[in-house]
Swiss-Prot record:
Protein name as catalogued: Transport and Golgi organization protein 1 homolog
Subcellular location: Endoplasmic reticulum membrane
Quaternary data: Interacts with MIA2. Interacts (via SH3 domain) with COL7A1. Interacts with the COPII coat subunits SEC23A, SEC23B and maybe SEC24C. May interact with APOB and MIA2. Isoform 1 and isoform 4 interact with SEC16A.
Signal peptide annotation: 1-22
Region (Mediates interaction with MIA2): 1211-1650
Upper lineage: Eukaryota, Metazoa, Chordata, Craniata, Vertebrata
UniProt keyword annotation of Flavoprotein present: no
Keyword flag Transmembrane helix: yes
Keyword annotations from UniProtKB, A to Z: Coiled coil, Deafness, Diabetes mellitus, Dwarfism, Endoplasmic reticulum, ER-Golgi transport, Exocytosis, Glycoprotein, Intellectual disability, Membrane, Methylation, Phosphoprotein, Protein transport, SH3 domain, Signal, Transmembrane, Transmembrane helix, Transport
Domain SH3 residue range list: 45-107
């Protein structure tokens, strides 16, 4: 309770602050929240698709209502609300709902944008109502208790996460960034968790840790208390899983509703994760980092350890991210070692994985402080190990200690720490519970395992608890199992040591076994842990598949506990068994023995699990082998498995039948193949055996098994290497990597796991039969079985590699299983399917089981049976997988992927049994259907089981109601309708679930090839639906069918996944019986498999060696003898696989002979001993060919020489007479019987007709009477009602009369008053009408004014538009002009500047000009005055120069001035132009401004006018509205009246239409009845005609029988004459013989006259030994004459047995029924028309097809082609044409007697035939007697017509030969020589006999008339 204060603090801190904000903040206003989280800015994109976990009805219309299972589409989430509320749509309705009530199925986007909310987001989305007073979501949803519990859950989840974080900072780090697990508890925690709470969380976790430390200090009390509190916390935290647990009833501590809601989410995810991790890929198992899981999945323990930390960090993140989806809830196996290792690494790993799965039980482990962890480690190791060591006698402790210390000391410490708290707590808690190994399941599960899905944490705690119990249980179980196993091990070790002694490298077999056991032990223990967990899980799961998932955690715990025990037991077993077996085959052997011993207990489940795994493993052979190892289970587990086995068979039976069949078929086929392989090995030399191993192993197992046989260590290496190959496949998974590491650590384990996996398929199947309870023999045979299992493993591998035929065979068997699978899913069904499957599996298993497994422990048998039983569930998958493997479609890669899925499935198997019961209760239909854990877990992996259960329950209820309501004759149709509707609905929902689950798996990164698994799951759905359907329709029939085969239930359990776990008590007797039942198919299959394996052995051996290269291929290294010795037990072990006891005996004899020959050969001196081969050929084929040659020679001698005996006449006169008498008697009896039967038939028909007529009459009368009664009753009721009503009416009317009289007086008064009122009203009404008229007039005026105003308004609008357009145009012009003005102004400024320049220039020029003028004047004056001086100055050149220059300068200046003046003039002109333009633009601008002002004035005036008009309009509208109201009132009154009248009219019409319809229906019924009457009359007439025809035929038959009797009498007379002749001849012959030999020999063959002797008969006996039909006619009347020629005389009326089969047409046509038997049996004779033309086929040429013969028989037997005698038609009469007189020899022609001969044919030549014998015509009316037109005696005596030499008929072959003259001794004295008869070419037999035409005619006519 130390955590209580922490909880309170958390509650206060987390809940109160959140509750307060839940209340409406003033800031939020009329909103639930200020912000919402959307996928896009508009919140229009989908965020999630979910599924409602519970029904929800919102407090008002703002919330959306939904029911459980409804799909919910989420568009946005409200941010930071206490009860986290999402908004989404359900169907067409949109609204808010609490997040916790849905489970997210698909996430469309992970991006979340925070968008502010608006008040319009919180109105009713359908009607827009927004008058709500409360916007506090917490208060609105307060009616949901969810949130309280959710708060606690989230708090607890926070606490747990804190604990996990403290324990695993990496995990906490990883967890924090991973909010995606929102789907699980993370969403709740998201609302709860905030950055502010992290400190609190740390404090809380520290408090928790302290409390845990204290509690750990107090192991019994403190731990229990803290554990309980932690469990509570965990349950709260894991409410989602707990909801599952609550459902499973494992944890009732948490509020059911909250748990359910949260649990639904987590459940599905966890279930999928658990299922996947638990039995999916071994890689998943690796995730758990338990050595067991490592061992289970990856054989690489070292790799696992290395990956443990990495993976766990990653796994924690993944788990946190996926919280329940992680594949990490992988198998956690607690064994002697694994109990330690899981405790070690498992705790570290589990803290991450399990904590991540929010399994609070792990919290206990996780919360344990590091110091405590160390102590716990020591405690666990010392505690569990000491227990295990005590149990195992120290070997296991050594192994466990060494292995654990070496492989995972740290992990052990961690796991031990984590586990110790639980183990300590669990121990005191479960001391009582754990006391009984049988109770282990219960005890283990007694621990409150709130986390069912959180297998990781649960597993950790389970490791702890499992250690507690597991230790105790393992003590007990190990002690028990150890004793048994030690005995077995001793024997097995002795056997193996003897076998392997050569291979053991001089170490004592036991020591080597121990060493190998240690190494293998580590592996096997790890594997066993995994196996145990798988087993316990599988067992638990099988017990309650529904609960398994929910209780996945608890299951894993119990599984771990049991696994611990199992591991200990197995360790012991393996040590004992396995000193040798642990070697290559040790693990398989140990697995088998332990599987048989432990797995028989748990092994049943484990094996079933492992078997199914193995099936998958067969694909992933290596990977799955690892998983298959989990079969090992502790004795406790064994007990559990037994219970589980009991349940499992049921579960298995419930398994989808197809799967079961497939599984069983695959198992049986694989087993048979393995067995065959083993048998083949036994038969073959050691090399052949090795090859066989190699083939079976397919390069992996073979080498391993052989190596293991030869050298235990190398075998392990080879197996490890073999495992490496599969592990490489697994490497795709992290688990595979871990597996590699673990494999590197424990190569032996890998080998074992590999072998175990291989074994499991065999063993699982064999195990199913192994239930044969003989334990002690199993010790020795265990070793043998181990060897055989090695071989079988090799065979399994061979099956995988070369075993494609096995798959095909399995698939062949599957149909059988499928057929039976269709039966109700019950044990009986299982037994049926088992029966079906048993033929092969049964034989295989029974042989193994009966021979070897009988010796095996009953537990082993149980295990194997359980294995076989369970495997079927996955066998179907595995079958698919195997088929894929075999077919090469998806080799081991896909197989590995599928095994991963299976491993996932398997983890749930560890679910606690108690939970199962609860879950079973929840899932009645599914649990009753899935009686196998694996299939159920797989099913749960993909589907929401509860939703499907609800749908199935609904379907069942619908079917029930339909069944009850519908009539019996119509029931099936109604049920089918309901079934189809429900089926489509359920399948669509299931497909959606599957899609969502696949998408989730994809999101979670689970890359699995689940195609077959998904298909199998969908098949399961369909099977479930059909299961529910046929529960209601044919449940009784199916039940009877199912119940029939109790014996085969055991086998069936084994075969069909029934998991004879139930039938642990399978006795050998049952097995033997099953063996007896199964015997036939397996032998063929075995032979085929053996042949195939031999064929592929050689080719595959090198491959196997290559695969095995890593380990020394000990097969080759070891001496052949040793290998053979090893293989002999293997072969011996597998030989029993052939199912029948006879085969068992043969196999035993064969093995004994093989051994004896080997020993004899060994005794020979070396120089004489044969080499390995015979001139390059193997000895085996040489021996076989020699034996076959001798046997064939002997048979030839026997058939030729020895069979030759003195010839004795076959028939004597007495015999003939006796037979004739008997025949006559039989004939008379038959005639009497026929007549009696005919009379009876007639009477019965008459009775039938009478009864039918009576029934018809009675039924008609009954119907009429019923109708009359109904009508009378109705009339009576109506009359009674009317009478009552009339009485009441009378009384009421009387009362009313009194009242009415009073009322009348009052009414008169009121009438007067009313008249006054009426007058008043009339005046008022007239006034109102006047007012109305006025109003109408005014209204018209108003309307006209309105129209006018509207027109004016329209005109004004148009003017306004025009003005506006003009304004726009003017404004444009104005803008242009203003721009021009601006440009002009600029140009004006420029011109002004230019003018100033020009003015300046002008001034300058004027100055220049003035100066020039001045200068000119000066120059003139100077020139005049100083003319004389000029010369001087010029002479000087100075003065003159200056003047010139001045002049020039002045001239230039003047020029410049002139230029400037011209420029100025130009500029001035430009300026003038611009000024003109400016003036014009200014004037236009003024004009435009004036126009604009005018327009504005106009607009204002128009607006004023418009306002006035609008006012007028308003007033007019008001008037109009008033008038409309008046009119409406009047119209309403009128409409009411009209509606009333209309309603009355419609009622009248309705009544009339109803009456018309009734009249029409009545007329139709009358017509139908008339039609039926006519039909009945027609039928009666037809029946009368048919009966008359039958009477006529019977009369004809009676007449024909009479004729036959007459003919028989004549035939007897003829026979007497012949007998007299024969007597005479006999006397003559005897006299001659006596004279010759001087001996009184009555009858002796005449050597010189073969024709006097009956030739040796080649054909078989006749069907009943009576006189057969003549060889001529093949038992028919000879008319077609295309039959065999009569090869012997009349005297040769021999037994059919003496006649060659080919002579009477038995070759081609049906065997001719003996003439006598046909008549004696009362059946129409073959020749009779009644017998059909079946026998006619013989008469018409035998080569012809039956259809043709039938046609011939129908067409009056007229041949289709030319008649057999061309020129002489067969049917002389029908064919027309005179019949030539027959030529005859000898006495006058004999009539065709009933079976008598026709007149004798000509002498026997090659082309002729001897005359027809007396009975050589088919039974029936003598041919001559039937055709009255031709009297038989009308034929002339003489020779029968010879065959014309013209063209022969289509099937006639005329054999040329000299015609012999008629024999002197008489035509019928002797048969022709045997050479003539026997050596005739087939054509001669096929040609018709040259019988006389008369015979042909008579017979043909007889046949013609017979119809």
């Amino acid at each position: 309770m130390a955590a209580a204060p922490g909880l309170l603090v958390w509650l206060l801190v987390l809940r109160l602050p959140w509750r307060v904000p839940g209340q409406l903040d003033p800031s939020t206003g009329r909103r639930f929240s200020e912000h919402k989280l959307c996928a896009d800015d508009e919140c229009s994109m989908l965020m999630y698709r979910g599924e409602a976990l519970e029904d929800f009805t919102g407090p008002d219309c703002r919330f959306v209502n939904f029911k459980k299972g409804d799909p919910v589409y989420v568009y946005y989430k409200l941010a930071r609300g206490w009860p986290e509320v999402w908004a989404g749509s359900v169907g067409r309705t949109f609204g808010y709902f609490p997040k916790d009530l849905i489970q997210v199925v698909h996430e469309y986007t992970k991006e979340e944008l925070q968008v502010p909310t608006d008040e319009t987001d919180f109105v009713c989305f359908d009607g827009g109502r927004d008058d709500f007073h409360n916007y506090n979501v917490e208060e609105l949803l307060g009616f949901l208790e969810l949130y309280n519990s959710a708060a606690t859950d989230s708090e607890k989840a926070v606490e747990k996460t804190l604990q996990d974080m403290e324990k695993n900072p990496e995990l906490s780090k990883e967890r924090e960034p991973e909010p995606e697990p929102v789907e699980a508890n993370s969403e709740e925690s998201d609302s709860v968790f905030s950055e502010n709470t992290e400190d609190l969380q740390e404090q809380f976790t520290t408090q928790k840790h302290h409390s845990h430390a204290n509690s750990q200090a107090n192991h019994a009390q403190g731990e229990q208390a803290s554990f309980e509190s932690f469990e509570e916390m965990l349950q709260d935290k894991l409410k989602v899983p707990e909801s599952e647990n609550n459902k499973t009833s494992n944890s009732s501590q948490v509020s059911n509703e909250q748990d359910k809601i949260d649990a639904y989410k987590l459940l599905k995810k966890e279930m999928t994760l658990d299922l996947k991790t638990k039995f999916g890929s071994t890689a998943d198992a690796l995730v758990s980092d338990d050595e067991t899981t490592r061992l289970v999945t990856s054989l690489e323990d070292d790799f696992d350890e290395e990956l443990d930390t990495e993976y766990y960090a990653v796994g924690k993140e993944d788990e946190e991210n996926q919280e329940d989806f992680d594949e990490l809830p992988l198998l956690t196996f607690t064994d002697g070692e694994d109990m330690k290792t899981p405790a070690k690494s498992g705790v570290e790993k589990y803290p991450t994985d399990k904590e991540q799965n929010s399994n609070e039980e792990d919290k206990v482990q996780l919360t344990v402080p590091p110091g405590i962890k160390n102590d716990d480690k020591n405690i666990l190791t010392t505690w569990g190990d000491t227990i295990f060591s005590i149990v195992t006698g120290g070997e296991e402790t050594r192994d466990t200690m060494d292995l654990e210390s070496s492989s995972s000391e740290e992990e052990k410490e961690d796991d031990d720490d984590a586990l110790v708290p639980d183990s300590k707590q669990g121990k005191p808690q479960s001391a009582t519970d754990y006391s009984d190994p049988d109770n282990v399941d219960d005890g283990l599960f007694i621990v409150d395992i709130p986390k069912t899905n959180n297998d990781k944490e649960v597993n950790a705690e389970h490791h702890i608890k499992g250690k507690g119990r597991g230790v105790q249980e393992s003590k007990r179980g190990l002690v028990q199992d150890k004793t048994e196993l030690e005995d077995e091990n001793q024997e097995g070790m002795t056997v193996h040591s003897s076998v392997h002694s050569n291979n053991l490298n001089s170490m004592p077999a036991a020591e080597k076994g121990k060493d190998t056991l240690k190494s293998a032990y580590d592996d096997t223990e790890n594997d066993l842990k995994g196996a145990a967990i798988h087993i316990s899980k599988g067992m638990l799961h099988e017990e309650k598949p529904g609960e398994q998932i929910l209780e996945g955690g608890s299951e894993s715990e119990s599984a771990q506990k049991a696994a611990g025990n199992q591991m200990n037991d197995r360790k012991i077993q393996q040590e004992s068994l396995g000193s040798a077996p642990l070697m290559g085959d040790d693990h398989p052997n140990a697995s088998r023995d332990s599987v048989e011993g432990d797995a028989l207990v748990n092994g049943a489940k484990l094996h079933t699990l492992s078997v199914e795994h193995q099936r998958e493993e067969l694909k992933e052979e290596l990977v799955l082998k690892t998983q298959n190892q989990p079969r090992f289970s502790s004795p406790d587990e064994i007990d559990l498995p037994r219970e589980l086995e009991d349940e499992v068979p049921i579960l298995g039976r419930n398994l989808p039948w197809q799967q079961e069949r497939d599984v069983a078929a695959t198992a049986s086929k694989q087993m048979s193949e393995k067995i065959r392989l083993s048998e083949g090995e036994a038969k073959e030399d050691s090399l052949d055996e090795e090859f066989f191993h190699h083939k079976a192993m397919q390069g992996t197992e073979v080498g391993q098994t052989d190596q293991t046989d030869s050298t235990g260590g190398p075998a392990f290496l080879s197996k490890v290497e073999e495992d490496d190959y599969p592990s490489e496949e697994l490497l795709e998974d992290e688990n595979a990597i871990n597996a590699k590491r673990s494999k590197e650590k424990n190569p032996g384990n890998q080998g074992r796991q590999f072998d175990v996996n291989l074994q499991v398929p065999d063993r699982a199947v064999l195990g199913t039969i192994h239930p044969d309870p003989e334990i002690e023999e199993s010790k020795q045979e265990t070793s043998m079985i181990l060897d055989s299992e090695k071989t079988s493993e090799t065979a399994a591998k061979g099956v995988n590699t070369g075993g494609r035929e096995p798959n095909t065979m399995v698939e062949k068997e599957r149909p059988l299983a499928d057929k039976k699978a269709q039966r109700p899913f019950e044990r009986s069904d299982f037994s049926d399917s088992i029966k079906i499957q048993t033929p092969e599996l049964g034989e295989v298993f029974q042989n193994k089981d009966s021979d070897y497994l009988k010796n095996d422990n009953p537990e082993e048998h149980l295990k194997t049976s359980g294995l076989a039983g369970e495997p079927e569930g996955e066998l179907s998958k595995e079958d698919h997988e195997n088929t894929e493997k075999y077919m090469g479609t998806e080799s081991q890669g896909s197989a590995a992927a599928e095994p991963e899925d299976d491993s996932f499935h398997w983890t749930p198997h560890t679910s606690v049994e108690p939970g199962h019961s609860d879950k079973r209760e929840d899932l009645l239909i599914i649990s009753s259907f899935f009686k196998e854990q694996q299939s159920l877990q797989r099913f749960q992996k993909y589907f929401n089981v509860h939703e499907l259960e609800a749908l199935l329950q609904e379907m069942s209820s619908k079917l029930k109601s339909a069944q009850q309501e519908s009539l019996p004759y119509n029931m099936e149709k109604v049920l089918d309708k309901v079934f189809r509707a429900s089926e489509s609905q359920i399948l669509s929902i299931a497909e959606k679930m599957l899609d969502t689950r696949v998408a989730e798996n994809r999101d979670l990164g689970m890359n699995e090839n689940n195609i077959f698994e998904e298909a199998a799951v969908l098949d399961d759905i369909q099977d479930l639906i059909y299961f529910v359907r046929y529960k209601h329709s044919t449940a009784e029939e199916t039940a009877t069918l199912v119940m029939a085969p109790p014996l085969e239930e055991g086998l069936g359990g084994a075969m069909e996944e029934m998991q004879p776990l139930h039938e642990d008590n399978f006795s050998r007797e049952k097995t033997a019986e099953l063996n007896v039942q199964v015997p036939e198919e397996p032998t063929h299959l075995d032979q085929r498999v053996i042949g195939d394996t031999h064929a592929s052995e050689v080719s595959q051996k090198p491959n196997t060696e290559k695969d095995l290269d890593p380990g020394p291929v000990t097969t080759e290294d070891t001496p052949m003898d040793a290998i053979d010795a090893n293989k002999q037990p293997e072969t011996a072990a597998e030989e029993p696989a052939s199912v029948t006891p006879l085969e068992n005996a043969i196999l035993l004899i064969y093995s004994f002979m093989f051994y004896l020959t080997k020993s004899l050969v060994a005794t020979l001196p070396d120089d004489v001993q044969p080499g390995p081969d015979f001139y390059g050929l193997p000895w085996k084929p040489v021996f076989i060919t020699a034996f076959l040659g001798i046997a064939s020679f002997a048979i030839f001698l026997w058939r030729t020489v020895l069979v030759v005996k003195d010839r004795v006449y076959q028939v004597t006169e007495q015999q003939i007479s006796e037979k004739l008498k008997t025949i006559m008697k039989e004939n008379t009896e038959l005639v009497q019987k026929l007549s009696n039967y005919e009379q009876k038939i007639k009477e019965s028909k008459k009775h039938v007709q009478e009864t039918r007529k009576q029934n018809m009459i009675l039924s008609d009368e009954a119907i009429k009477y019923k109708d009359k009664i109904k009508t009378l009753e109705k009339n009576q009721e109506i009359l009674d009602d009317t009478a009552k009503n009339l009485r009441v009416m009378l009384e009421s009317e009387r009362e009313q009369n009194v009242k009415n009289q009073d009322l009348i007086s009052e009414n008169k008064k009121s009438i007067e008053k009313l008249k006054d009122v009426i007058s008043m009203n009339a005046s008022e009404f007239s006034e109102v009408q006047i007012a109305l008229n006025e109003a109408k007039l005014s209204e018209e005026k108003v309307k006209s004014e309105c129209h006018r105003v509207q027109e004016e308004n329209a005109r004004l609008k148009k003017k306004k538009e025009q003005l506006q357009q003009e304004i726009e145009d003017w404004s444009k012009l104005h803008a242009e002009l203003s721009e021009q003005i601006k440009s002009f102004e600029k140009s004006q400024k420029d011109l002004e500047v230019a003018l100033t320049h020009k003015d300046d220039n002008i001034n300058a020029l004027t100055n220049c000009i003035t100066q020039l003028n001045l200068l000119e004047c000066e120059s003139e004056s100077e020139g005049q005055n100083k003319g004389g001086n000029d010369s001087d100055e010029l002479a000087n050149g100075e003065v003159g120069g200056d003047r010139n220059e001045k002049m020039k300068n002045q001239i230039k200046q003047m020029m410049d001035v002139s230029r400037t003046q011209t420029a100025i003039s130009v500029v001035e002109e430009d300026l003038k132009l611009l000024q003109l333009k400016l003036r014009a633009s200014v004037s236009t601008k003024c004009n435009l401004e004036d126009q604009v002002k005018k327009l504005e004035d106009d607009r204002n005036s128009l607006q004023a006018a418009k306002a006035g008009l609008e006012d007028e309009c308003k007033t007019l509208r008001q008037k109009v509205e008033i008038l409309n109201e008046l009119y409406q009132q009047k119209e309403m009154a009128l409409q009411k009246k009209l509606s009333q009248e209309e309603y009355e009219r419609q009622e009248r019409e309705h009544r009339l239409s109803a009456a018309d319809e009734k009249a029409v229906s009545a007329a139709e019924e009358v017509k139908t009845y008339k039609r039926r009457i006519e039909e009945m009359e027609d039928e009666l007439q037809k029946t009368e005609r048919s009966f008359k025809n039958q009477i006529a035929t019977h009369e004809k038959k009676a007449h024909e029988n009479w004729l036959k009797a007459r003919a028989a009498e004549r035939a007897i007379a003829e026979e007497k004459r012949e007998a007299a002749n024969l007597r005479h001849k006999l006397l003559e012959l005897t006299q001659k013989m006596a004279m010759l030999q001087e001996e009184p020999v009555i009858v002796k063959p005449m050597p010189g006259k073969p024709n006097t002797q009956n030739p040796p008969r080649r054909g078989p006996l006749s069907q009943n030994g009576s006189f057969g039909p003549s060889p001529v006619s093949g038992g028919e009347c000879s008319p077609p004459l295309t039959v065999e020629p009569p090869v012997r005389p009349l005297s040769a009326t021999l037994n059919r047995r003496d006649m060659p089969r080919s002579e009477f047409g038995s070759v081609d046509g049906p065997l001719p029924h003996p003439r006598w038997s046909a008549e004696a049996s009362g059946k129409p004779s073959p020749s009779d028309p009644g017998s059909g033309t079946a026998t006619m086929m013989n008469s018409s040429s035998r080569g012809s097809s039956p259809t043709r013969v039938l046609d011939e028989g129908k067409v009056n037997m007229a041949p289709k082609g030319p008649p057999p005698f061309p020129g002489v038609p067969l049917m002389s009469t029908p064919m027309g044409g005179p019949v030539p007189p027959p030529i005859r020899y000898g006495p006058p022609p004999q009539l065709c007697g009933p079976f008598g001969p026709r007149p004798l044919p000509p002498p026997f030549g090659p082309g002729m035939r001897p005359p027809l014998g007396l009975r050589e015509f088919a039974p029936g009316v003598p041919p001559g007697r039937r055709d009255l037109p031709l009297h038989p005696r009308g034929f002339l005596p003489g020779h029968a017509p010879f065959r014309p030499l013209g063209s022969l008929g289509p099937r006639e072959y005329f054999i040329p030969g000299t015609r012999l003259p008629p024999p002197t001794h008489g035509p019928q004295e002797y048969p022709p020589p045997p050479a003539v008869r026997d050596l005739l070419p087939s054509g001669s037999r096929d040609e018709p006999p040259p019988a006389s035409q008369s015979t042909s005619q008579d017979c043909s006519q007889a046949l013609k008339q017979s119809p």
